């Protein structure tokens, strides 16, 4: 994954790997499967997509969401965490450019995975890690349109980890 500046405004956007860009229709099919309640088939398709394209953020995001719905925050944390890690790695390689607005389509899977990661961390009782993650991600888009800081700060229970 690489970073490209926007020509329209001073902002940056993730450019996803070619293998991920070629599989956008597959993700649309997976979303339709999930809406139809065919989560097992959707999961198998997502696992296959990751076997073909390990850096496919959208596939990690969808698997993380499925894991959260199935009350498996540990698995969700793994998928969301991998997507967030890939995003931060690309940012570091590009010299940590900013801003990185959620409003750009290429950035949405990263931010949505970060929100999922915060949820999974909170469900696992890791409020400190959730807050650290929220702060790090919110710094990329100070508008914090997904409310990561509010989400991480509002959770009242759980151990710190």
Sequence positions of predicted segments:
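Alpha-helical segment of the N-proximal tetratricopeptide repeat
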Residues: 16-52, 116, 123
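Residue at a conserved register position within TPR or TPR-like alpha-solenoid repeats
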Residues: 33, 67, 121, 155-156
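TPR-adjacent "capping" and linker segments in tetratricopeptide-repeat scaffold/adaptor proteins
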Residues: 8-25, 99-109
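Residue-level recognition of tetratricopeptide repeat
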Residues: 56, 90, 127, 143-145
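TPR alpha-solenoid repeat register
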Residues: 59, 93, 147-148
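Structural motif corresponding to the intra-repeat A-B loop/turn of tetratricopeptide repeats
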Residues: 36, 70, 124, 158-159
